């Protein structure tokens, strides 16, 4: 997969945003880390897919509610309502990126250590239902 330099930086910014957001959660919802994670994540998405596609992605009719929740949650985090902002922003992230969860689960199943765990007959139906993976009834 060939990426331009801007897209490589976008991947780094997105990953950094994810890490800062995760560290913000681990430090009991630290406002600065959560806000920095949001900013880095948005910059990363912008650099990866470009300005026009970013605008189209966030303003699709089926993604508007997720976009609104994400932005309201980020705004509440900036206003020091970090826990409520985190909950609302998480709902927005699910609304925006919920379609990708099936792809993520399939990718994780191809990994050496976690793949057999996610493919175990007792765990696989639960993970498939949570991720929205459609399985043929055969």
Swiss-Prot record:
Belongs to the GOT1 family. Residues 30-31, 89-112 are lumenal. Changing residue 73 to S: In got1-1; loss of function. ER-Golgi transport defect. It comes from Saccharomyces cerevisiae (strain ATCC 204508 / S288c). It is found in: Golgi apparatus membrane. The gene is GOT1. Nonessential protein required for the fusion of ER-derived transport vesicles with the Golgi complex. Can be replaced by SFT2. Keywords: Golgi apparatus, Membrane, Protein transport, Transmembrane, Transmembrane helix, Transport. Coiled coil: none annotated. One of its GO terms (cellular component) is endoplasmic reticulum. This is Protein transport protein GOT1. Its main location: Golgi. One of its GO terms (biological process) is protein transport. Residues 1-8, 53-67, 134-138 are cytoplasmic. It is a multi-pass membrane protein. InterPro entries: Got1, Vesicle_transpt_Got1/SFT2. Disruption phenotype: Lack of GOT1 is lethal in a strain lacking SFT2. The lineage of its organism: Eukaryota, Fungi, Dikarya, Ascomycota, Saccharomycotina.
